[in-house]
């Protein structure tokens, strides 16, 4: 949980002075996930102890509202239950943040060479088609992300002044997370290819292209939180511009490297 998220009133948990100090002094032992799990467990225990009909109804209603969110983080589930101000955006940010976490970790590990996959060989005659497929894979995922992140999320958030649909937000964010997974897989395919030696320079130019798009995608959750945090909240439109592109001169370099490879074959 970021500092901006901690500062939001909706994320508050009532603690006694002693417990409050323990949590503040040792945040590693008392993670946000642990505290929210405690809060939900405490709520269930109180409801059971009271034994009131309305408490039982509320618990069943909460379980119904959380259907589909069983695998989501504790914070995401709490947002669904509490529906604080701007909950639609905070839920989106938390689902993406938690969904991106393992992808981001694995991508960083890939760049540092912490793991490797079996190498695939390819013949010269198939290299052009292979390169075209990798680029199409990247473009297709970016197009899907653009539509999901604009049309899909705007519909899921609901019209101005009306509440959004939490299950629609869950589904759309999962589409974006899936696209990030596919981009990571494309990056792995490119890195663990063994082309004929004269095509190695072309392959090197493809390394990092899918990852470049991933790094742009990872900016989304923190940006949303920064705009909805209590201290940064401001009226008006907020627009995040993500740039999915290639390095300057990349296309020309690929064409040149490919032509040189063909001439030397």
Q: How should these model regions be labeled?
A:
Residues 1-12, 23-40:
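Histidine-centered nuclease catalytic patch
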Residues 21-24, 47, 54, 263:
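Charged/polar positions within long, soluble alpha-helices
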Residues 15:
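The −1 position to Zn-ligating cysteines in a subset of zinc-ribbon hairpins
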Residues 32-86:
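Domain-exit/linker segments immediately C-terminal to small folded modules
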Residues 21-24, 29, 82-89:
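A short, terminal or domain-edge coil/loop segment
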């Amino acid at each position: 949980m970021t500092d901006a998220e901690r500062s939001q009133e909706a994320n508050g948990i009532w603690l006694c002075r002693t417990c409050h100090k323990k949590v503040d002094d040792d945040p590693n032992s008392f993670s946000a996930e642990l505290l929210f799990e405690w809060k939900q467990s405490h709520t269930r225990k109180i409801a059971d102890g009271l034994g009131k009909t309305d408490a039982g109804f509320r618990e069943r209603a909460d379980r119904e509202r959380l259907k589909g969110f069983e695998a989501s983080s504790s914070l995401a589930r709490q947002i669904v239950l509490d529906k604080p101000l701007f909950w639609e955006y905070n839920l989106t940010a938390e689902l993406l943040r938690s969904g991106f976490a393992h992808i981001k970790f694995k991508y960083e590990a890939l760049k540092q060479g912490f793991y490797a996959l079996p190498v695939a060989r390819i013949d010269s005659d198939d290299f052009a088609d292979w390169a075209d497929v990798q680029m199409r894979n990247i473009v297709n995922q970016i197009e899907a992300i653009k539509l999901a992140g604009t049309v899909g999320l705007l519909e899921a958030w609901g019209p101005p002044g009306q509440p959004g649909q939490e299950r629609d937000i869950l589904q759309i964010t999962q589409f974006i997370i899936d696209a990030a997974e596919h981009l990571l897989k494309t990056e792995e395919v490119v890195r663990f290819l063994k082309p004929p030696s004269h095509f190695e320079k072309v392959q090197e130019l493809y390394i990092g292209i899918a990852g470049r798009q991933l790094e742009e995608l990872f900016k989304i959750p923190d940006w949303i939180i920064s705009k909805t945090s209590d201290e940064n909240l401001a009226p008006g439109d907020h627009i995040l511009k993500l740039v999915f592109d290639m390095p300057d001169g990349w296309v020309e370099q690929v064409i040149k490297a490919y032509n040189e490879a063909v001439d030397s074959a």
